Structure formats: C-alpha cells, structure tokens
Amino acid sequence: ETYGYIRENVQATFPDRQIGLNTSADFSKVVISSSSDKFPGALHYYDVMEGAIIEVADFAPWLKEYELGDMIPFNFTARDGVELTGYITLPPTYRKGQKIPFIVHPHGGPNAKDSFGYRPEVQIYATRGYGVLQVNYRGSVGFGLEKMKLANKQWSLAMHDDLLDALSLSLIHI
C-alpha cells in the first residue's frame, strides 16, 4: 500500500517519464530514476514525510535546449501471421505525410530487444531528418519461449522478413 502510494505520487510528478524507485526499509526515503524517449534520465531524492522531491543529477542537461524526436511504439503482424512489436522515431520537424529517409536500426542478438526509451544514436539520426525503425523481430528476448523458437534457423530468412514487413507497414502509416 505504501509503495503504491509513493509510486502514484512520483508518476504524477513525472507523467511523461518511466520511473524506477529504490526505497528505504521504512519507505520514508526514496531514490527515483526517471527517463523518457527524449530524456536520458535523472536521479531524484524523495523525502516522503516532507513531500519534497529534489533533483540530484540530470544525466544530460545540455539536451534540454534541443528538440528531439518522438518514439512511437507499434504492433504489427508479420507476413506469416506472427505478432511482433517495434518503435518508430520520427524527426522533430516531421509533418504527417512528409516523405523522409528511414534507417532500419536492428538490435543485436538475437538475444536482445528494443524497448521504449532514450537512445542517443536514434536521436542523432532523427534530429538530422531520418526516421528510425527498431523492430523486435522473432527471437528478441522477453516475448516468450514460443517466439524465441520461431527464430530457430531463421537468420537471414524470417527474421529479416520481419524487418522488411515492419518497414513496409510503418511507411504506409506515418
């Protein structure tokens, strides 16, 4: 109950950020980490009894003067019916219907995955006018054993088809 109360208060303070909490044993003191797709992160100290949240460290204060691209999560169905996920980051100057070059930015692995959050290389591309596509193709971790098995012997085959399918679908819908 106490943890839930703390989490609600912190999330209300940082509504557009992902948060992590580390609490003292009695829940009176909290270290907060916060980040987003356009914000690499900060650490805050929260004295629950006083209700005060104080920023301790901003990991990249120099970025505040720049407009960065939005990361948009999406789901899609690959050509063989497999349900997959990905992210598109668009340039901050992008307007609906505008034609832009795209970079397909696959994660390593296959024992890895892309997730929502700040990625410096993605923002570098986006701020230079590129759309960036990140795909959790079959075999990406965190999606269950069955999805992992679908990647067996599929390097340069179905795994690459997943990337191409995601690119085709995202170009239609942006």
PLM regions: where:
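Short, non-transmembrane alpha-helical segments in secretory-pathway proteins
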Residues: 2-15
